[in-house]
Each structure stands twice: as C-alpha cells, then as structure tokens.
C-alpha cells in the first residue's frame, strides 16, 4: 500500500474508478460504509473528510449532537474485487468536529491511540492471527411471540450421511470433531478457501496457511501473516469481508463462535510479540525460550483476562464456545506447545520469531478494541512486573477437579466479563487510549445484548421444563 492523497487521486484517474467506498467500524465491530462518485475525490478530501450522522450508530452520539466526520486514510486504499462497478475502498477515522481529533468511541481511533502509547514506550508490536469460521449451505432463524428457532445445514455435515440427494449421496463426510484435516473429497471446501486466499492476496494480505478445522459442517481457518498494530486490525476486516463475499456466491459464512451444538467452536488465535531496536524482546533463556519481559506480558494478560474477555469475547455466543471438552482454552495458564492452555508458546526455528499465542479470543470481537486491550494488559504486566506463576505442561483438559480449581479461568458469561470490565479498566485508560466515555457507550451496547437474551425464552427450556 503506502499511498499518499495525491497517489489516490492519480489512481482514481488511471483506473477510471467509478466509486469510492468510505468504511468505518462501529462499536460491535461491524463495518459500515457510504459511497461517493470517484470524480468528487480531491486531495483536500483527506484533510476535510465527509460529514455523516453519528446518532444512527449504536453507542455513539445523541441526535442533538450527531454531526461527525469520516476522514479517509489514503494508505488504506484498496480495490474492491466484489463490486460490479470499479470501487476503491478507503477506511476512515471518525473525527469529532468540535476538536478535530479522533472520536473517543471510534474503535479505529482507540487503536491509533494504543499505537501512539506503545511508541511512547519505545516498543513495537507485531502479530499473526488465525480466525476460524463456518461455511453453511443455508441458515434460517425465527424469533417472535409464537416461538424461536434456528437451523443450519451443510452438505458435508455429519448429520447428512443418511440424507437422500437427487444426484445421490456420495458419502465422504467429516465426523463430529473429525475435520482436522483430511484431503478432498472429505475436505469439500479446498477450492472455496483457495478462492478466498487469492482474493485476500489481491487486496494486500499475506496469507500464511488455510485448512479445514476440527468441526464438521464446514469449519475452516485462514492464517494471515505478521504485521504491525493498526494495519493488522485493518487486515482482519479485509479477511472477514473476503470470507463473507466469496462464500456468498453459493453459500453463507459466519464467524459466530458456536453456531453448531455438540462440536468445536470457532476462535481467533492471536500470536503476539514485542520488538525494540530491531530485536525481538520476547526471546530469552527462560521457560519456553521467553524473556522475563515476555513472562510479565503474559502475567498482565492473565491478571486482566476477565476484563479483556469483554472485548475479545464480546458476544453471548462467545461463552458457549468457552466450555470444557471442545478444545476451548478455558483455563488461564501458559505452556510451551500445549494447546489446552489459554496462552501457548509455539515452537519456532529462530529466536527472532519467538512469540506467544493468546487462544481465547473469537471473531465476534472488534479487532481494533480487542487487540488494543490485549496490548494494554500485556504492557501493564511489564510495567508492574506481574509474573504469571508456573507454566502448566500437563493436559489441562484431563486435570482432576481439585487441581483445576487452583487455576483461574476465563469469564463464564458475557455478564461476568462486563462486570469484570466495570471493576478492572484502569489499565485500559493509560495514555488516554480508552476513555470513560468509550466505556460508558460500550457497556450500554453490551448490557443491552445480555438483556435481550435474558428475556427471550429459549427452545431448550421447553425440553427441560415444559412437563414439570
């Protein structure tokens, strides 16, 4: 990328770009957009921005103070491969007109403040993330006064092994927890994932790997390579956009953590490391080849994990994944290579690649907020020398109950995570990265989600209680 405003204007002219799509991210992490004709974009657009109504975005402005500005980032310019008309995407900061500064509740502005705070420490941040997702052939749901229900289906799902198809049932299906990772024809989505990866590469991402994941019914993972803080979050948005749109040709993709009952859920494993003066300061001669700084970083994440869960696992559905027996990282421990721990130290060939993998996040997270929160927790651990105690090299899933009781766990529900965030958020406020205004708006949005589920009768309640 590396575009300047003049580069973007030149690109619009050279490529005869018809439309510019201004994109920004709301509190929940969903991208929003507004399009303008390409010919109206001038260099001044990148300093003056475009006005919009902020009162329509949940958790933001009231109608009495709704004017806001979208300020496009020229360095984010990328052609959209899915639009019929030639369209250039520009991701935007949301600006407060009264101050000319990034809006306190704008997730992208939060991420930029985190980057500024990180630079003030003289440290750099890199990461690799691997989101998991499902691709279904169909999905339906219904919620009204007469009842509620949902239904997902995928031809490759284990439950379709006895289904009659017009062209015949060819078998070759994945069993429950059997998706990791046989070759085609059992893996029926090799070409689909390849098409996704090619589109991601076209949009500037560096794809590291793709494969079928553990669950039946079309669970997959695509890993995207290391990069610095703000571009990483932008790449996460591109990845989700590509997955949704490539799948939408004939199917439907979801990043919900637990759309299928009885099989593994989908996470977003985030690999992180810190560097200073060109050196990886996570590399050392302590446990797992880590430095003392890396251990303190882990200690900060473990200490603040339940509050961080409110941002890394911000949906009620997140906690249907974070339960025992489905390879979910529910215990706050760290270990070299051990995937049952919530923080893993992967094997690497060189100390330059030394990193940690935080395994509890999922892709309902707003990446601008989630990655910033993990960073702030880790930096707090370094600043306060929070040691994470002894590493756990045992299979944590097989520990007796009395041993498990001595290991802290992630939040068990969104409600618990929000309570933790209410009580433990000072580490987020350092350097003005997050603010009390942001916290108020975020909690309003998320408590409303908790309340929606709380007052909605669930079908399984009929199974448990109808005949009592």
Swiss-Prot record:
L-glutamate binds at residues 264-265, 321, 327, 339, 359. The modification O-AMP-tyrosine is found at residue 397. Keywords: ATP-binding, Cytoplasm, Ligase, Magnesium, Metal-binding, Nucleotide-binding, Phosphoprotein. SUPFAM superfamilies: Glutamine synthetase, N-terminal domain, Glutamine synthetase/guanido kinase. Residues 107-468 form the GS catalytic domain. The activity of this enzyme could be controlled by adenylation under conditions of abundant glutamine. InterPro entries: Gln_synt_N (IPR008147), Gln_synt_N_sf (IPR036651), Gln_synth/guanido_kin_cat_dom (IPR014746), Gln_synth_cat_dom (IPR008146), Gln_synth_gly_rich_site (IPR027303), Gln_synth_I (IPR004809), Gln_synth_I_adenylation_site (IPR001637), Gln_synth_N_conserv_site (IPR027302). ATP binds at residues 208, 271-273, 339, 344, 352. Mg(2+) 2 binds at residues 132, 213, 221. Residues 15-100 form the GS beta-grasp domain. Its EC number is 6.3.1.2. PROSITE patterns: GLNA_1 (PS00180), GLNA_ADENYLATION (PS00182), GLNA_ATP (PS00181), GS_BETA_GRASP (PS51986), GS_CATALYTIC (PS51987). Belongs to the glutamine synthetase family. This is Glutamine synthetase. It comes from Acidithiobacillus ferrooxidans (Thiobacillus ferrooxidans). The lineage of its organism: Bacteria, Pseudomonadati, Pseudomonadota, Acidithiobacillia, Acidithiobacillales.
